[in-house]
């Protein structure tokens, strides 16, 4: 989904085709129920078809010995909810009938596994054993999902072992989405994420053992040091729910991706693995070999690890441990342009004395300045020392171009430990701890390693689950979780780097040829620290042919945002070689925050109630309501400033001081937010033929705004000010070198001091400042509506086909728009843009944050599956879609 154009929703029809095919070890199909649990349901009848009430059903987890007992009701039904996913034996006993036992029941993640029994009149004490492959379709649930178990995950080709890779095999997936920077708030700036059903990538939820792992700053998947989401070897099963009308599934409308980690069992088990790819296995680039000054950069991937699990006490206490390590050397080839030694001497002879020290220090940072001579406009001489010809002169003695072969080193390691405890038949618990540490080579400079930047990205998380059986009809599952992570980007010794070169110097245009010096120092320090607490609780109550569920998903989130440090290192530009020679800056931009980092608090409280009603043995109706409260993001330091309303609602009188139109000392990002966001959902599943199921549903979903919204709104003046000096700036100053008379950087410092004084004293005529405006009044929460109608048919015992129509509509989606622009063509041209001056000269760029964008999607999704034998299954997905944004 893309943002609308100015004043008009940018709408363009388009058609999409998507075909995906995969062959993997057979996983049981899942229908979404809970995030970390499963269930076994069924009905007991006799040979005449009459139901058998009061039959005793005993289930046993074959791996861990967990046992639970239930009785069939007056209609012969039984329901055992909130089970740990795994392999179970189910035994049924009733007076006058021979016992029956099925040892091949696989209760998958989020699945209600249906197991029906037909009892025979007892003629001996022998137990009847029943078995058979799990059906390819589940007739009791209207949701759409794809499930992969551990053997499937291990054997599925997966570059990098990324946890999110299996998403692309779900119906309706759109791979490798990307968008413009304006899409970032809307979540369509892809980052390798997957989109479903025309909804943005931030509408995907990644849940591991009940712990939401989305990056809270972007709401996208959370790859750390290697930009991979590691931990695949610790996963027992993943379920991708793309049409989930069960309100206990969560808030995410596009997909809810649930993972559960492996557990120890009564038998010791484990594995070891090593994946390696090095330079010796990779061909060199032809053009690198053709150039004597370059060589093939070093490349290496070393991905290894192992796991071990087993019993501590038989049938009682179990452990599992997994360790994963990744070492990566990424090859990098860069082409750089550097000043020649002769040109350096020429510049030093012409510069004013007070700028020579800065330039001498700058030239020393270039190091190797050899290379192929490059012709540059205004260069006065050639590489052989002769004067350049032409008017203006156009010599090749000022700049040398060469290639640089180097590599960046990243490493990451993940340790996962889990304990499972069967306290007694009515109480079970598990605990999982994970530590993910590593260092990312955030930027590798081709000129001087002094400007290299790194990011240490540790993450520590804890999750637990506790199941209590009050009775066979009332079971509660409590699932708290916690995570903390840090992701800060800067050179290893930032102060040393700035002492060596305190600015970033950029040439702009073909006549300013030299490669940027200073790396990405103008973007450092940036990043975040994030602390999150989660409280999930799900109460399941079976009453007759109803199963009621009540629960909560609560997230408490503390974001320490370090992005306010961006721009504090000045960026100085020049546009011609003459400007470089004379030390003249075209622009100099510098940001002045009162603090380089600020905390923000978020609370997301969701409550839900749901009824799954078996109207008949063949027809199931699910109806539920989810209520969401998203707090108004709070800065406890009251360092938020914003306009008194949307930009077009304020007075644009230039004689009105800025402190009369910009509100300061605020804690909340918005004036007000909704107290409740109601999300009703309903669906049916109707098995109108023995091998055919019709599914239909409608639901409303509301996603969270990403934490990056704090970057936008909390970067407003007077707490964060940005000014531009230089020839093209408004603050004045011309010298490239800082700290000298008439310095462009010094002019920005003076402009900031002038603005701070003038703002606090209510003066007018201040230097124009950039600002982000928010909507007037209460923020409209973004939400989605989703509906579907589908048929699924099983062919024999080895194949199935599915066709479904999916429609979505997104409403009140966030977008950004520049609203203080102007045009210089003519009076009345390009209306409503004003001529020759902005609508409000007190401001520079004004970014309006709004939530008025929308989209519509219609798609036909076809899926065919075939069991191939030897544990293999093939699947083909085809999607035809039409999206109107």
Regions inferred by a protein language model and the residue ranges of each:
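Solvent-exposed loop/turn elements at secondary-structure boundaries
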Residues: 163, 497-500, 508-514, 635-679, ...
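Outer-membrane beta-barrel channels and translocator barrels
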Residues: 201, 262-264, 313-315, 424-426, ...
